[in-house]
């Protein structure tokens, strides 16, 4: 039996994360979508800049999130994200679970997959990455990405 929160289990979880491969910051805008099954739904557009695989990049994405019966959020970016660099572009798809924050923002944790032919971003092809996506109540976003070992 594994007890969540034990020091030994925490060390095991940390070892599952590989190298940090991306850090982005930027802004978001939200749009309310028609409710699904009586629960709120949202669409978010994000524009960020940062580094991915050591390369300066710009990113744009649109994702949707639906509130679940327990108040949590499930979000998807179904191949509607793009990362641009000086030698090409990458597209990405992502899914994640999240929750609203006290200041009116949201935080998500999930998986992201990149596809590219840009030479500078080839290191992200064919890998499952995990991420933290945090947005404050003013729409300021931070996206951190790690390889999943």
Model-derived features with residue positions:
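Beta-strand-enriched cores of mature, soluble protein domains
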Residues: 2-149
């Amino acid at each position: 039996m594994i007890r969540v929160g034990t020091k030994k289990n925490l060390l095991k979880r940390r070892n599952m994360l590989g190298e940090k491969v991306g850090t982005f910051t930027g802004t978001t805008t939200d749009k309310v979508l028609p409710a699904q099954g009586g629960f709120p739904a949202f669409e978010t557009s994000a524009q960020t800049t940062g580094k991915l695989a050591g390369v300066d990049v710009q990113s744009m994405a649109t994702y949707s999130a639906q509130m679940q019966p327990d108040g949590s959020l499930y979000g998807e970016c179904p191949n509607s994200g793009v990362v641009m660099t000086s030698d090409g572009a990458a597209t990405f798809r992502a899914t994640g679970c999240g929750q609203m924050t006290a200041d009116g923002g949201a935080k998500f944790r999930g998986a992201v997959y990149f596809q590219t032919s840009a030479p500078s971003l080839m290191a992200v092809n064919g890998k499952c990455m995990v991420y933290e996506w945090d947005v404050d109540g003013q729409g300021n976003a931070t996206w951190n990405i790690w390889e999943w070992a």
